[in-house]
């Protein structure tokens, strides 16, 4: 998956 802000 991908995480970020």
UniProtKB/Swiss-Prot annotation:
Highest rank taxon of the organism: Eukaryota
Keyword Membrane: yes
Keywords: Adaptive immunity, Cell membrane, Immunity, Immunoglobulin, Immunoglobulin domain, Membrane, Secreted
GO cellular component: extracellular region; immunoglobulin complex; plasma membrane
Primary location: secreted
A GO BP entry: adaptive immune response
Subcellular localization, as worded in the UniProt entry: Secreted; Cell membrane
Quaternary state and interactors: Immunoglobulins are composed of two identical heavy chains and two identical light chains; disulfide-linked.
Function: D region of the variable domain of immunoglobulin heavy chains that participates in the antigen recognition. Immunoglobulins, also known as antibodies, are membrane-bound or secreted glycoproteins produced by B lymphocytes. In the recognition phase of humoral immunity, the membrane-bound immunoglobulins serve as receptors which, upon binding of a specific antigen, trigger the clonal expansion and differentiation of B lymphocytes into immunoglobulins-secreting plasma cells.
Protein name, entry field: Immunoglobulin heavy diversity 1-1
Lineage: Eukaryota, Metazoa, Chordata, Craniata, Vertebrata
């Amino acid at each position: 998956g991908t995480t970020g802000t």
